[in-house]
Regions:
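Short, flexible helix/strand-to-coil boundary loops that buttress conserved ligand/catalytic motifs
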Residues: 10, 20, 45, 141, ...
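Short, surface-exposed acidic
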Residues: 102-106, 188-196
């Protein structure tokens, strides 16, 4: 968790760790952070009531709105389309390598990208926390207690964190009422909602590409059930995309 990010976020009055000490030990720099009690929302999601999910969603969107106002400037070459292209390129390479899923799904999403190009071209480099999905968002006794593992701050469309969370919940075979509450707080218009569904599809193929991969000493599990579940999620999302045009 880089110090400069915590320093930037410290002005937002949001529940993040406090830097207690920093220093250098040998060739390594280190931070000692305050402890925040709680567990990842994905680990306790089944225990949350609808009212608790709604309150958490309200607080998360309020946090994102605060983060959007920090002074963080994008590189001159920043372009939101590069983010999308990079995600799809990575997923395509992985799916080709492991061959658990139909590579034509990438081509399908690229066609949707063209249909959404006018919207994507207008996305500005707005700061937001892009990795608070089913992890990194701590819950204690049904309440939001903190945000951890902030390795970077996203720049672009805040709807991506909602899309990532939705696909993660679907992949865990959990309900998505929390997503409904997040969207209720964000109030996306018709075009923004289409973009949200598009981002869900992008993250879906990203999840597909990870299946069977080796990360350090961990292999991402893959079997017929997992393959079917992700294929089904993709199909449901495509149906939703098509309904956006009805």
């Amino acid at each position: 968790m880089p110090f400069f990010l915590l320093d930037k976020l410290s002005v937002c009055d949001i529940p993040i760790p406090v830097v207690l000490m920093e220093g250098i030990y040998g060739n390594y720099s280190y931070l000692i952070l305050s402890y925040i009690d709680g567990d990842d929302i994905g680990n306790v999601y089944c225990k949350l009531t609808d009212s608790e999910k709604k309150q958490i969603a309200r607080e998360v969107v309020a946090i994102q709105q605060k983060v959007s106002g920090i002074d963080l400037r994008a590189d001159k070459e920043w372009n939101w389309n590069v983010f999308i292209d990079t995600m799809l390129y990575r997923a395509e390479g992985r799916i080709k390598t492991y061959q658990y899923f139909d590579i034509n799904k990438i081509a399908t999403i690229k066609k949707l990208q063209c249909e959404l190009q006018e919207y994507l071209d207008k996305v500005r480099p707005t700061p937001y926390l892009d990795d608070i999905s089913t992890k990194n968002l701590l819950i204690c006794d049904g309440k939001l207690s903190g945000i951890i593992d902030i390795d970077w701050i996203g720049m672009g469309d805040m709807l991506t964190f909602v899309a990532l969370t939705r696909v993660a919940l679907l992949n865990m075979d959990l309900d998505t009422k929390y997503i409904d509450y997040l969207l209720d707080e964000i109030h996306p218009n018709a075009v923004e909602y289409k973009a949200f569904v598009f981002y869900c599809l992008v993250y879906c193929v990203d999840f597909m590409g990870e299946r069977g991969m080796q990360f350090l000493d961990k292999t991402i599990p893959v079997n017929k059930s997992i393959i079917k579940r992700l294929d089904d999620i993709f199909d449901v999302l495509m149906e939703e995309w098509n309904k956006c045009y009805e």
